[in-house]
Curated annotation (Swiss-Prot):
Organism: Mus musculus
Name under which the protein is recorded: Secretory phospholipase A2 receptor
Disulfide partners: 55-68, 93-110, 181-207, 195-222, 263-356, 333-348, 408-503, 480-495, 617-634, 699-796, 774-788, 840-937, 914-929, 1066-1086, 1208-1222, 1279-1376, 1353-1368
Tissue: Widely expressed. Present in type II alveolar epithelial cells and a subset of splenic lymphocytes. Present at the surface of polymorphonuclear neutrophils (at protein level).
GO cellular component, one term: plasma membrane
Domain (Ricin B-type lectin) ranges: 42-165
Cytoplasmic side: 1418-1487
Residue stretches spanning the membrane: 1397-1417
GO molecular function: carbohydrate binding; phospholipase binding; signaling receptor activity
CDD domains named in the record: CLECT (cd00037), FN2 (cd00062)
Record motif Endocytosis signal, residues: 1435-1441
Keywords: Cell membrane, Disulfide bond, Endocytosis, Glycoprotein, Lectin, Membrane, Receptor, Repeat, Secreted, Signal, Transmembrane, Transmembrane helix
């Protein structure tokens, strides 16, 4: 009977498992009624209404509010990929149907493209598109409305539902190149919101990297921090008998930050290298499989130098001898070069393999650091300074490093060594007290590779390098180190340089040492500190009664380090300690609550995503985030307290911030009371937008930094400054110094200039992807995390009393002030009105004109501060004798006036009078033009806002010619090769027809010609020659060009042979379907035959009939290039556009190549309105995808550096793409009818060898070898040893698949070998099996086969996707290819609940039947695990892992062999059910 009761419980658990809930959570639900800690650790929570105290439960077709005290699996939620909210019990994501907003919210399949599934938190609100928020109706139904409703996580403390965001898990091994997991993913019919072990023999956690594993078969193992607490698990390797583990991720391709994040998730860090022995161990395990790998070396802390990401001291250096100063300064992340085992600096956004390291003995350094902060009273000889049982003496007789060493040794001391941050603090204070700026310390190196050692013989356990240090001086074997006063940082110096130096020796510690602090208090510097262990509210702790005289204030990183060591002895998990920082008045700025004198905030040490909100009080945290600061509720939260009091009554130094009254230099700007000046560098004034690091370097050239806001008043000023310069409707984003680049800063945000973070700049910004480590500022007081490599404008900040430097490249311009697309120059030296009219003209500007009240306000605000130069300022207005004859000096009409009343009473005068503006009132008046006054000039950049009018009326063209843009075009590509022409022959043909070779004056004409080259394989002559490439053959100037970047004018290309370099060249337009070259221009031999051509001539206007094609209405259905397009007209959102397309049995248009783009460019120009296209993003603009599933690398953005402005894309009237909010209303959409193609079955699976394989159609490919550089012959032999062949490309689909996979490796791979050979006899290229190369891609021109060197080999150049000849001895990556060899095993298909509605009775029957089967099996097995995976007699293949081989990976999951290749039901399913683009069905849930 007991067994049957247990079986009933198991039956219920089995039902939960079928619904997709994790086994462990299902077990929890059987015996707990409150949300468990395990749920929270997995990121699962229950959503509770803050006001109603009820919780959201997913029902059959609606969401309702239910009693929270009876939790079930349908109440469990989790944030998953792309900001989706996943319901564990319902196996679906919360979605909003934009087309039916009145409907209640419900669950949808998580990869649906027809429903809005993205949500974000905003002050306890759950907000979706169109500002719709999760709300509740009176019947407790959950709906979307624009009213506010607040939600919290149902826990004992009522946490925030966004405290557990979805984080990218970067996969290990597998075949996904390290790409992050996608959650949820579907496997065997079930959706999984977490990594699983099912289907994997070794029971390691794994995930898919696309939403449906069976469709793409992309997967990898999950990082698991719990897998190696005391030993190295299967994915790690151990270094001999040490307790250090290494993980070689040589098939991954990640940026430095992504690699760093991957290692951190496993409890490790990117590789640090302590010495040559460790480097030798690493080199032996790389086996030259890859060229370069990421290591933990970086200089991402703007205030420090090079460092290891795990905090290991940087004393061993092995920089490559070839490294130049440029990359060393510009690139901030380090790599290990495999062949030379030397280090290089790289752009951190490059994608490379990486190595993780984990030290199982990581606590030893923490114990040592804690001891260094303990106070010890010390006695020293006269003139020596005591500190922590040692005595120090700064000697001011300047000596070389060796001289300093001998001098100290002669006094029975050593040249100072530094073993801790506590000693750095003492060093800084000693230098300040002695008024010294720099000193020798005892660190030096006399080795190659460089290995710094202390002259005292002590171990190097701590380093503290200055920015860009340690720099290895060229041609110097001996290197010596100094320390500077400002922050104690170290620099590498020439040992012969003469500096001050510090000697160090042992001191005397008295037996009865007294710290000077009361009992129970600890001393640090001049203060005593104590922990009050009683839990109190902030009001109680800060009252002065329990913590006398006050709570702790922290002023520096040194004091913070001391506090961290102090609380480490009592800090347990989830322990907190009050400090004096607070924002109780809800001002938005955190300040110290002190008794008496105000103390400014000089330093902050926030935890990740802190400060989370305004109006709170601050605690220091214990446990895993030891020492970090967090905001808590001042009244309700209880914590211990940190107290601070001076050792004795000192004369306190004035700590009030001094406000310098020096005006800002040059054209930097500030406001009264601010200690800093700011300058906005916007696109109108600089050559290009810049990345965050480039912008910071730009500011540093002026002696400044990217802007920081040390006070809320500074942010207010910058916001007003931006409003004064730019139209508020402009979506501009500016880099500021806010960043979290420093890997040692635990993911917390900081200012690049070291200013304290005093405000909650990123309220509820929980969705901060690993790639977004820098912040941009918008003019609505909003900070947005952004990818540091993206390009933006920027703002610099400099202290008011610091004079900016002027870099050599800086071209000083008079201090013009920018305001809404115009600039203004204020001349403070008075002169007559006529003089300034001449001066403004000489400066290529106009006398000031004022066209609006806003411009009037801007001018008045500026001259108000310049009143000392004069009250009256000339403007560009004059009047004659008659009052109504008044106009601006540039001839424009007066459309805005702001006259003083006195003007109306003025007596008319025949004398000419000129107009001024008052700096006091802003009103206008008149004055004698000869009176000298200050004045204002204005220069305007004219923006064209209307199309050019047609030069003539529409005409006609001869038969066979194409009419476009009031010209006639003839595209001629003869089918008979004998009729193809030279450039001269083509020009003669065109002249004979009354025209010339084409001259292209605009992007629109270029698009028209390009669209008419679709399907052609022959390039065409156009009317340009190299002898005069600035004029067309018809004499018109070249005002538009479309040259190929790979074919620069007058520079021989890589295919050019020696005898071709001096022959005449003429221009061709490429018809190559590769979008890198489609429509591009390039030069070739004018005398070469074999090309088509394009003629043009003027239209015929003698006849009066109008060309119908150019003026008639555009039909709603158009055919082009094997596609059918439909035009939808009317105002609509992106979602409504998609719905309208589907009503026409179509999809929002995808644009796969340059030909279709050219067609749509011409079409949109005719339509005259912007139109939606099918492009959208779910990751804040990192990647955009086509809604119909099309995958193409082709893009046509207006500006690749454009700011990300929304999740959906449209095409403008020039065809260019822009992003905008999906809820915006545009005037139409472009659809295309999707052709339903029957999917071909490609049976068989990839066999397992020493490399992993990815299947495409009927073949398997090894991409792990692309990082293994070999000669052609070695690569060919390697593939043969694997039972495969070197890559041969048979068709365009295969070529697209290969490029998509290869582009994931980024810049790590440039070329791979192709299995082709050149036949010298007949000058042709053939595959190695003898078949011809029907699929080829030579780029702009085919190589000259007659002048090739003997026996060349062929590579695929990945960035352009073209083929290229290269010597066979070169070392390149390669891909092996073979037919899918393992036959698929027949299995019955599984159907998940998300695909059908299962009646309750049938479900119960199946559960009962399954229960009986499980009971029988349990009786048979007796001791077997009831949930062990059952395997029948299908002959399933279980691959064995062997991680000792660097490139040996597992790529076949057990389930791969259980595919049903004969499933006719699935094969014949309607297209609307099988295509991802049509997944918008709600998920129905069984009760």
């Amino acid at each position: 009977m007991v067994q049957w009761l247990a079986m009933l419980q198991l039956l219920w658990l089995q039902q939960l498992l079928l619904l997709g809930i994790h086994q462990g959570i299902a077990q929890d639900l059987t015996h707990i009624q409150e949300p468990s800690l395990e749920w929270r650790d997995k990121g699962i929570f229950i959503i509770q209404s803050e006001s109603l105290k009820t919780c959201i439960q997913a029902g059959k077709s609606v969401l309702t509010l239910e009693n929270c005290k009876q939790p079930n699996e349908h109440m469990l939620w989790k944030w998953v990929s792309d900001d989706h909210l996943f319901n564990v019990g319902g196996s679906g994501c919360l979605g909003l149907n934009i087309s039916a907003l009145e409907q209640p919210l419900k669950l949808y399949e998580c990869d649906s493209t027809l429903i809005s599934l993205r949500w974000h938190c905003d002050r306890k609100m759950i907000e979706g598109p169109l500002q719709y928020k999760v709300q509740v109706k009176s019947d407790n139904t959950v709906v979307a409305r624009k009213q506010i409703h607040r939600w919290i996580a149902y826990t004992s403390s009522g946490g925030d539902i966004c405290e557990h965001p979805s984080r990218d898990l970067y996969t290990l091994k597998g075949n996904a190149h390290g790409m992050p997991c996608v959650f949820p993913f579907q496997f065997k019919g079930h959706w999984h919101h977490d990594c699983i072990r099912e289907g994997q023999k070794e029971h390691l956690l794994w995930c898919a990297t696309t939403s449906r594993y069976e469709e793409d078969e992309k997967w990898g193992f999950c990082p698991d921090p719990t897998s190696m607490k005391v030993f190295c698990d299967a994915t790690w390797q151990r270094n001999g008998s040490s307790r250090i583990c290494y993980q070689f991720n040589l098939l991954s391709s990640l940026s430095w930050n992504q690699a760093h994040s991957s290692c951190l998730m496993q409890g490790g860090a990117l590789l640090s290298i302590a010495d040559e022995d460790e480097e030798d161990f690493i080199r032996k395990h790389l086996s030259k499989v890859v060229k370069e790998v990421w290591i933990g070396l970086n200089q991402l802390d703007e205030k420090a130098g090079w460092q290891w990401s795990d905090g290991t001291p940087l004393s061993y250096l092995n920089w490559s001898q070839e490294i130049t100063p440029g990359p060393f300064v510009e690139h901030h992340c380090g790599t290990l070069e495999v062949v030379s085992a030397a280090w290089r600096s790289r752009d951190c956004e490059s994608t490379l393999p990486y190595i993780c390291k984990r030290d199982l003995n990581h606590t030893a350094q923490g114990i040592l650091e804690k001891d260094s902060w303990k106070y010890h009273a010390t006695h020293c000889d006269p003139d020596w300074t005591p500190f922590n049982r040692k005595c120090y003496k700064l000697k001011k007789d300047r000596k070389s490093w060796l001289g300093a060493l001998h001098s100290c040794q002669s006094n029975d001391s050593v040249l100072m060594d530094v073993a801790s941050l506590a000693e750095v603090e003492f060093l800084v204070s000693l230098l300040r007290d002695e008024n010294a700026s720099e000193t020798w310390i005892g660190l030096s190196s006399n080795k190659i590779p460089v290995s710094f050692e202390w002259s005292s013989g002590s171990s190097v356990i701590f380093t503290n390098w200055y920015p860009l240090e340690p720099r290895i001086l060229p041609n110097r074997r001996q290197l010596c180190v100094s320390a500077e006063e400002s922050d104690g940082r170290w620099k590498v110096k020439d040992c012969k340089e003469r500096l001050f130096y510090i000697c160090k020796k042992a001191g005397q510690v008295p037996a009865d040492e007294q710290s000077g602090c009361p009992a129970g208090w600890e001393r640090h510097g001049r203060f005593c500190y104590k922990i009050d262990t009683v839990l109190r509210s902030f009001e109680e702790a800060s009252s002065g009664y329990y913590c006398s005289p006050a709570l702790l204030t922290i002023t520096s990183r040194f004091e913070q380090a001391f506090i961290t060591s102090l609380i480490s002895s009592v800090a347990e998990k989830d322990s907190y300690f009050w400090i004096a920082l607070q924002d109780q008045n809800n001002t938005g700025e955190y300040t110290w609550k002190t008794v008496g004198q105000r103390e400014p905030v000089q330093y902050t040490y926030w935890n990740t995503r802190q400060p989370s909100n305004r109006g709170g009080c601050v605690v220091v945290r214990g446990g895993s985030s030891l020492g970090r600061w967090e905001v808590k509720d001042c009244s309700d939260f209880k914590a211990m307290s940190l107290c601070k009091t001076p050792v004795k009554i000192w004369e306190k130094t004035e700590l009030e911030e001094r406000w310098p009254f020096h005006p800002c230099y040059m054209d930097w700007e500030s406001a009264t009371g601010l200690a800093s000046c700011f300058k906005v560098f916007h696109s109108e004034k600089v050559l290009m937008k810049r990345s965050w690091r480039e912008a910071e370097a730009f500011c540093e050239e002026f002696g400044a930094h990217l802007a920081s806001f040390a006070h809320i008043e500074e942010e207010n000023f910058v916001n007003e400054l931006l409003h004064s310069k730019f139209n508020w409707t402009q979506e501009r984003q500016f880099w500021i110094g806010f960043n979290r680049r420093n890997p040692l800063n635990a993911g917390s945000w900081a200012w690049s200039d070291g200013s304290p973070v005093v405000s909650s700049f990123l309220d509820n910004a929980y969705f901060e992807e690993d790639a977004k480590n820098c912040a941009v500022y918008k003019a609505n007081k909003t900070l947005l995390p952004s990818n540091c490599a993206s390009k933006h404008e920027w703002i610099c900040r400099i202290p008011r009393d610091v004079r900016p430097k002027f870099p050599d490249w800086y071209q000083y311009d008079a201090p013009w002030l920018f305001y809404q697309n115009a600039e203004y120059l204020f001349h403070t030296h008075p002169a007559e009105w006529a003089t300034f009219e001449f001066v403004c003209g000489w400066l290529r500007s106009d006398f000031l004109t004022i066209y609006s009240a806003q411009e009037q306000e801007f001018i008045h605000s500026k001259i108000k501060g310049l009143t000392k130069y004069g009250v009256k300022w000339w403007i560009g207005l004059e009047e004659g004798g008659a009052r109504d004859q008044i106009q601006w000096s540039n001839g424009s009409p007066v459309i805005f006036q702001n006259w003083d009343k006195g003007r109306e009473e003025r007596v008319d005068s025949q004398r000419k009078r000129c107009v001024f503006i008052s700096s006091i009132t802003g009103l206008w008046g008149t004055e004698n033009c000869s009176v000298p006054l200050p004045s204002i000039c204005k220069r305007v950049k004219i923006w064209v806002i209307e199309k050019e009018k047609p030069p003539t009326q529409p005409g006609t063209c001869p038969k066979g010619w194409l009419y476009f843009n009031y010209k006639c075009f003839l595209v001629t590509i003869p089918k008979d090769p004998r009729e193809l022409k030279t450039w001269t022959g083509a020009q003669e043909f065109c002249v004979a027809k009354g025209g010339t070779l084409v001259s292209i004056k605009s992007e629109l004409e270029q698009a028209f010609i390009t669209m008419n080259l679709f399907g052609q394989t022959t390039n065409v002559w156009i009317g340009l020659q190299s002898t005069n490439h600035e004029k067309w053959v018809n004499g018109k100037p070249l005002v538009y060009s479309n040259w190929s970047p790979s074919d620069i004018i007058n520079i021989p290309s890589y295919n050019t042979t020696e005898f071709q370099k001096h022959i005449p060249l003429c221009a061709l337009m490429s018809s190559n379907p590769n979008f890198h070259f489609t429509g591009k221009w390039y030069f070739d031999d004018c005398g070469k035959e074999g090309y088509g051509f394009v003629c043009e001539k003027m239209q015929d206007t003698l006849e009066h009939h109008v060309n119908v094609s150019d003026t008639s209405a555009i039909p709603s259905t158009l055919e082009y290039g094997n596609r059918t397009y439909k035009i939808i007209r009317g105002n609509m959102t992106w979602y409504a556009a998609g719905k309208s397309c589907r009503m026409h049995r179509a999809e929002l248009a995808s644009i796969p190549d340059a030909f279709h783009q050219a067609f749509l460019t011409v079409l949109l120009s005719r339509l005259g309105h912007t139109h939606w296209i099918g492009l959208s993003t779910t990751d804040n603009g990192q990647t955009f995808d086509w809604s119909d599933g099309t995958k193409s690398p082709f893009t046509y953005w207006k500006d690749e550096e454009s700011a990300f402005l929304g999740d959906c894309a449209f095409a403008d009237t020039n065809g260019r793409w822009h992003s905008t909010a999906c809820e915006s209303f545009l005037q139409g959409a472009i659809c295309h009818v999707v052709t339903e193609t029957k999917a071909f079955e490609h049976p068989g699976l990839c066999s397992e060898t020493s490399v992993p394989w990815i299947k495409f159609k009927g073949n398997c490919y090894s991409f792990s070898t692309v990082l293994d550089s070999r000669s052609f012959e070695d690569a060919h032999e390697f593939c043969k040893s694997e039972g495969s062949n070197l890559l041969a490309i048979r068709d365009a689909a295969e070529n697209s698949f290969l490029l998509e996979e290869l582009l994931a490796f980024g810049s790590s791979v440039q070329m791979v070998w192709l299995n082709a050979q050149f036949d010298n006899n007949n000058k042709t290229l053939r595959w190695f099996d003898g078949t011809p190369t029907e699929q080829s891609n030579w780029g702009l021109r085919k190589p000259d086969m007659d002048h090739l060197k003997p026996h060349p080999c062929v590579v695929l150049r990945i960035p352009e996707g073209i083929w290229h000849f290269t010597p066979c001895e070169d070392k390149k990556g390669f891909i092996c290819k073979m037919e899918a060899g393992i036959p698929a095993v027949t299995a019955q298909p599984e159907k998940g609940l998300s695909h059908s509605i299962v009646p309750v009775t049938v479900t119960l029957t199946l559960i009962i039947a399954l229960g009986i089967f499980m009971l029988c099996f349990w009786i048979y097995k007796q001791k077997s695990d009831i949930f062990q995976r059952l395997t029948g007699s299908r002959g399933s293949y279980y691959p064995t892992l062997n991680f000792s081989t660097a490139h040996l990976e597992e790529n076949i999951l057990i389930s791969d062999l259980e595919k049903n290749t004969n499933d006719e039901e699935v094969r014949d399913a309607p297209a609307t059910e099988s295509k991802r683009g049509h997944k918008g069905r709600p998920i129905c849930i069984s009760p």
